[in-house]
Every structure is written in C-alpha cells, then in structure tokens.
C-alpha cells in the first residue's frame, strides 16, 4: 500500500506532497498580510501505483531502496509541513481588561516587524499609551488577517477596525485635534500608503530582494535554512499573484519603482518641515506612514528605497527617526546614523542589536521612570553633551501625549 501526504485547511489552502513531491498552494491574500498557514496533515492511499510498480519488476534491490527513499521523503515532508505551518495546540489567552496583540514574530535585523501593518498598530498602541501584551504565535484571526487583537474576549482584525474598536471601547482618539479637511486628507493619504505604496514595498521585500529578506526571518531549529527558503518562495509567489491582481504587478520593475518614488515624494511634500504629517501633534496617520516608511528605511537597507529616503528625502528619514526615538526607546539600531552614513560604510559594517522585547508593554509604566540617559550613545546626530539633535522635537512639546490621547 502506497500513501500520499498532504495538508487540508479551511482557509482556501491546499498543499499536496503526494505523488511527485511537488508543492502547490492556493491562498486568498490581501493587503494586510496573511503569511501564516494552518491545517491538518492527512495521509491517503494511492490506488494506481500497483500497475506501475509491477511493470518495473519485482524483488529488485532498487525497489526496496525506492520504498525507503519514498518513506523518508514523506516523513521529511510531514516534518517540514509541521514546522512551516506552525501547527500547535491553541493557547488559552486571558484578554479580560487587557489588549492582546497577535502578530508575526520579530525578525532578526533589529526591526520590530517586517509587516507594515503590525508595526503600524503597535506604534498606534504606543502613541495612544495603551498597555498591551504581544503574542507571537503566528495564528491568524478568524478572518485570516494579521495583526489582530483580543480585548475582553472580543477579537478584532484589520488595523482600521482595530483602531475604531479601541476608540469606541477605551475613549482614545489621536485625531481629535484634526479639522474635517485634515481628517479627509488623512484618510486619503492612508489609502494611498496602504493600497498603493504597500505593494511597492512588498515587491522590494518579497520579490526583488528575497534573499536579503530570507536572512531576516527568525526561524531556528533543524532545517531552519530550508524552512526559510520554502516560506520566502511561497510568499514570493503569493505576492506576485496578488500584485498582478491589484494591477501594480503588471508593470516592469522600473515602472514599479517609479510609482514608489512618486508616493514617497508625495509624503515628503506633505510633511515638509512639519514635525508630524498633520502638524505639531501626531495622529493615527503618523502610525500608518511610520509603519511603512520605517520598513523601507530600516527593513530594506541597501536597496533603492532605503537609499532614496536616507539620501534625497531627508525629511522623511528624520521624521521616522523622531518617532522611533519617542515611541520605541528599546529599538536600538547599531547603525543609528543611517541618514548620515559615510561613503565608506558598507553592508559588512552594519550590525543589529537584537530587539529587546517585553511580554507586557506600557510606555508610561515601563520607560518613563527608567530615564533615557543610559541609552544615549554618541552618534553623528548628537552634540558633545550627549543630547540628540532631535530632543527639541521629542521633549519640548507644548502639550503632553497623555492629554492628546484623551
């Protein structure tokens, strides 16, 4: 009796590793990433192998070798699927009066997330000063989305709906200072970033620079390199198909980067010399734009986008640096002077400090009492006293963040 091994999922995903050990995948994927895969490994008998094998002869030494090799391949396929699809027992999460944020695991390049949407919503929670707990379980929401939250046993997915839910339940509002015109501009820019610029970023990460992205994935254990390769190439195929359906994927690489540059120049023009996109106070739009531009700046180092932001669009780079230092004090980039990098500094000189993660986060409770003096290092953007050139932007607001959120 010969058996095939495959994966059955309720989320429009079928992986077949039976007869020719090939991998086929069909997945419904949108602009908010669905990079995790779940399902059940099943085995099923193959009825038509008898005639084929009888034609090959019997009692041959290579026949036994074929059996052993086939069994080993099936066992390896089952193991790889188990590791790749992260099949595990569902953990019980107590979300009573607590925000549980489900997102992808931290990459190993020092950036909090390679997902612009995960970075967006986590930055929003920090801007709103809402304590939350991270869960890097890779589990998608019931709608197949990532990130998603649980609060008082209610599950909400989609960053826009998450923010609406938190505003309604907790009374926070980062946009209360915006007039109707500014709110309209904010929504239009949000859609440009999430529905247009996002796809150029995905192209850069998962198509054009796939090898570099593969190095950033935080996968450990046996066959980790093979698992990274499989996951990256699966994601590349998904991204290319989704980009083609969206329309951007029908253009050449040069045309895609031209569209990306237009979006970045539009953002740089909107920002101008302001502290935040809508003026002196941060808003939800800043969390959205930061999630995407920060990934382009620190998550794609050495690429066209990173060089364009750090070089010509200097105000966008300084804007991201301000937000990073204000709301991500534990995010240390050893190449902290990205914007002012010298010509002789190469990729080999870049190192990354592992992201210092906390199981529970509250900006006021975790960091304000600790003080930031110990975390200041001498870089080209600090003066001889050790104070950052960005301190005037960070510490001398005419209002408190707490008052803005209420």
From Swiss-Prot:
Pfam families: FAXC_N (PF19333), GST_C_6 (PF17171), GST_N_4 (PF17172). GO terms for cellular component: membrane. Its main location: membrane. The chain crosses the membrane at residues 65-81. Keywords: Membrane, Transmembrane, Transmembrane helix. It is a single-pass membrane protein. Residues 335-357, 369-389 are annotated as: Disordered. The keyword Calcium does not apply. It is found in: Membrane. May play a role in axonal development. PANTHER family: FAILED AXON CONNECTIONS HOMOLOG, METAXIN RELATED. Belongs to the FAX family. This is Failed axon connections homolog. It comes from Xenopus tropicalis.
């Amino acid at each position: 009796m010969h058996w095939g091994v495959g994966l059955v999922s309720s989320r429009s995903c079928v992986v077949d590793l039976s007869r020719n050990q090939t991998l086929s995948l069909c997945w419904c994927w949108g602009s908010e990433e669905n990079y995790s895969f779940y399902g059940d490994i099943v085995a099923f008998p193959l009825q038509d192998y008898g005639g084929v094998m009888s034609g090959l002869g019997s009692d041959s030494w290579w026949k036994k070798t074929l059996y052993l090799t086939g069994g080993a391949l099936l066992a390896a396929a089952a193991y790889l699927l188990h590791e790749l699809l992260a099949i595990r027992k569902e953990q019980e999460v107590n979300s009573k009066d607590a925000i549980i944020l489900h997102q992808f695991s931290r990459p190993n390049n020092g950036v909090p997330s390679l997902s612009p949407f995960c970075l967006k919503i986590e930055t929003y929670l920090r801007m709103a000063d809402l304590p939350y707990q991270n869960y890097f379980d890779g589990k998608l929401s019931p709608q197949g989305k990532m990130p998603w939250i649980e609060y008082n046993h209610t599950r909400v997915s989609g960053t826009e709906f998450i923010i609406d839910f938190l505003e309604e339940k907790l009374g926070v509002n980062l946009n209360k200072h915006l007039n109707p015109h500014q709110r309209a501009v904010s929504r239009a820019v949000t859609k440009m970033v999430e529905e247009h610029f996002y796809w150029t970023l995905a192209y850069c990460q998962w198509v054009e620079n796939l090898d570099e992205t593969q190095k950033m994935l935080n996968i450990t254990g046996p066959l980790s390199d093979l698992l990274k390769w499989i996951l990256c190439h699966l994601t590349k195929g998904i991204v290319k198909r989704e980009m083609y359906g969206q329309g951007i994927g029908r253009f050449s690489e040069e045309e895609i980067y031209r569209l990306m540059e237009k979006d970045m120049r539009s953002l740089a023009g909107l920002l101008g010399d302001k502290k935040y996109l809508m003026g002196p106070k941060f808003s939800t739009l800043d969390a959205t734009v930061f999630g995407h531009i920060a990934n382009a700046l620190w998550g794609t180092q050495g690429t066209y986008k990173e060089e364009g932001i750090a070089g010509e669009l200097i105000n966008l780079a300084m804007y991201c640096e301000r937000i990073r230092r204000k709301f991500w004090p534990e995010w240390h980039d050893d190449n902290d002077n990205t914007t002012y990098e010298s010509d002789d500094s190469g990729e080999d000189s870049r190192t990354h400090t592992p992201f210092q993660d906390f199981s529970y986060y509250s900006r006021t409770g975790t960091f304000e009492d600790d003080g930031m003096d110990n975390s200041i290092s001498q870089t080209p953007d600090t003066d001889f006293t050790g104070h950052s050139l960005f301190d005037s932007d960070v510490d001398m607001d005419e209002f408190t963040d707490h008052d803005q959120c209420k």
